Design a protein with these regions (language model features):
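Glycine-rich phosphate-binding loops that contact phosphosugars or nucleotide phosphates
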Residues: 43-190, 221, 264, 268-312, ...
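Residues at alpha-helix termini
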Residues: 73, 237, 287, 331-332
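Short, charged low-complexity linear motifs
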Residues: 1-4, 237
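Peripheral docking tails and interdomain loops at the edges
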Residues: 305-350
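A cross-family phosphate/adenosyl-ligand binding-site feature
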Residues: 3-22, 126, 150-159, 306-319
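Active-site phosphate/pyrophosphate-binding segments
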Residues: 11-53, 142-145, 149-264, 334-350
Length: 350
């Protein structure tokens, strides 16, 4: 058996390993803001809010999927749109009776800054960011700060902290018991810590799955669309290699024809509503002689086996095997994962 290359350790790996602490800090911060619920209710009542627009770019956009589902199922008129598309093609979304929820880890993304500074907003805005003095934090009517701490390159701990903040916001909208919400977030942090305790074994086992692979797909449905979108993004960003994140349904409408021994399909099992559909896609990928990994509680691969959790929190756990895969692929290619050559941490240009 050929020698398995060692992961070249750097800032990205350190940020990944810091995720449990970042999550715990964020949970404590959210639970320590007793007036947040009242402030949100006041903001919605004062502005006679009739519609909610969820917006962001990159992983901040993908992280909105669980909240979009939860709010829509609860009867809220809710739209999810990339900020750039909204600015150029759907500016009328931001009417005076619309509450905008904008997510940006830096709070300085070009599109978010334009949204705030160029007169698009007619109604109130809730900003979720990791940066206290950012444009988003300063100009939002209500700001929810995550406590991920500084992050060097590829999004990881800020993404998980953002998912937590969005889950908390959803719990407020749905009038759920926040003590229980806090406990679920604490439990998720413990599971992340337990998983990352085996990071070296996980990356080593995933390197074996990458032999001869030229293309990676990451798929999911429902809440797991957050994982598919962010997973494809961070694989490209951290390894400079072709990877695509899309829904499992969209994968059947064309990309499935690409299945071969040179393709790795990472399929999120997801929640009970569509788990059987994702399981069937996984089995069909194997029959097509592609390499396939099932991410979830029913996986037969140790690095992809995850515990059960509330469905809206699945993306917090599902992204961990993708992070390990990015470390494994970069190691095979002989460079440090997440070491930017062309990109920068903050996308300041549209």
């Amino acid at each position: 058996m050929p020698r398995i290359p060692n992961v070249i350790e750097g800032a990205y790996l350190q940020d990944i390993l810091e995720q449990p602490d970042a999550m715990r800090r964020t949970t404590q911060s959210l639970a320590g803001a007793p007036f947040l619920s009242a402030d949100l209710l006041s903001l919605c009542t004062k502005n006679a809010v009739e519609r909610i627009v969820l917006t962001g770019m990159g992983s901040s956009f993908h992280a909105l999927h669980p909240l979009h589902i939860r709010l829509t199922l609860a009867g809220h008129f809710c739209t999810m749109v990339e900020t750039s598309e909204a600015l150029h093609y759907l500016p009328d979304l931001f009417s005076k009776n619309t509450l905008t929820v904008a997510v940006s880890q830096s709070g300085e993304s070009a599109e978010i800054v334009r949204l705030l500074c160029d007169g698009y907003l007619k109604g109130p805005i809730v900003g979720i960011t990791n940066t206290p003095n950012s444009t988003l934090a300063r100009l939002s009517n209500l700001t929810i700060l995550t406590e991920a701490g500084p992050e060097s390159t590829v999004t990881c701990k800020t993404y998980l902290a953002g998912l937590q903040a969005l889950h908390w916001l959803g719990a407020i909208f749905l009038n759920e018991k926040l003590t229980l919400t806090a406990q679920h977030l604490e439990d998720a942090a413990s599971e992340v810590e337990r998983y990352l305790g085996q990071w070296m074994a996980h990356t080593a086992s995933l390197q074996n799955e990458l032999e001869g692979i030229e293309q990676i797909f990451i798929t999911g449905r429902g809440y797991s669309l957050a994982t598919a979108g962010t997973g494809g993004l961070i694989m490209k960003e951290s390894t400079r290699s072709p990877a695509e994140g899309l829904s499992s349904a969209a994968f059947r409408h064309g990309p499935m024809e690409m299945l071969s021994s040179r393709v790795l399909a990472c399929i999120c099992l997801g929640d009970s509503k569509t788990a059987s559909l994702n399981q069937r896609l996984y089995e069909e990928a194997h029959k097509a002689r592609a390499k396939a990994l099932l991410i979830g509680s029913g996986s037969d691969h140790p690095a992809c086996t995850l515990p059960d959790c509330p469905a809206p929190l699945l993306p917090i756990l599902e992204i961990l095997p993708v992070q390990m895969l990015s470390l494994a692929l970069a190691a095979r290619l002989g460079f440090e994962a997440g070491n930017f050559a062309l990109a920068s941490k903050i996308t300041a240009t549209e």
